[in-house]
Amino acid sequence: MLFQEKHGHALSRKAVDRIFDQVPRKFKSETKDKMNYEDFVWFMLSEEDKTSIRSIQYWFKVIDLDDNRIITPHEMEYFYEEQVHRLEYLNHEPILYVDLLCQMNDLVKPSFEGHFSYDEIKAVRHSVGIFFNCLVNLNKFIAYETRDLFSLKHQLTEFPDYS
């Protein structure tokens, strides 16, 4: 599972703590601090397809520390600082936080720079996965950052043999 060491602790400890504090969704499990099957399915669906409305709600609640329906630079930095430490531990060069924030502003185009409302996040749902992954899922963030842009462009061209 994503919480275990053999998966490289894909999710950040801060995100896992918020999930087990039952912030994004109350557990149906009758055992304290344990997910039951239904809880796990909700989590996995939210983790694997971050473009669905329910998934966006789930991850938005994880990141929105003060529950005001706006993700602020402070909240993003709170989660990203753990990612930076994890990247450095793996000898990856982390992106500076200000650069990451700039990229997220370009992605979402919020009405107030650096402040991302739920509706603004939902409006870019086709590409919102990277917004959440850079803050909570190290493996998916690294995969995104190390993707081959030339190969992607080649795959997207109508006539790849002539590009």
For the regions a protein language model found, what residue spans apply to each?
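C-terminal interaction modules of eukaryotic adaptor/scaffold proteins
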Residues: 95-163
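Acidic carboxylate motifs that coordinate Ca2+ or other divalent cations, activating on Asp/Glu
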Residues: 66-68
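Amphipathic regulatory helices of Ca2+-sensor modules
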Residues: 1-11, 19-22, 34-48, 71-92, ...
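Hydrophobic alpha-helical bundle architecture
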Residues: 61-63
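Eukaryotic intrinsically disordered and solvent-exposed regulatory patches
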Residues: 21, 45-47, 58, 102-103, ...
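Alpha-helical interaction elements in eukaryotic regulators
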Residues: 12-16, 36, 52-59, 72-76, ...
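Intrinsically disordered, low-complexity regulatory segments of kinases
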Residues: 2-8, 14-17, 22, 26, ...
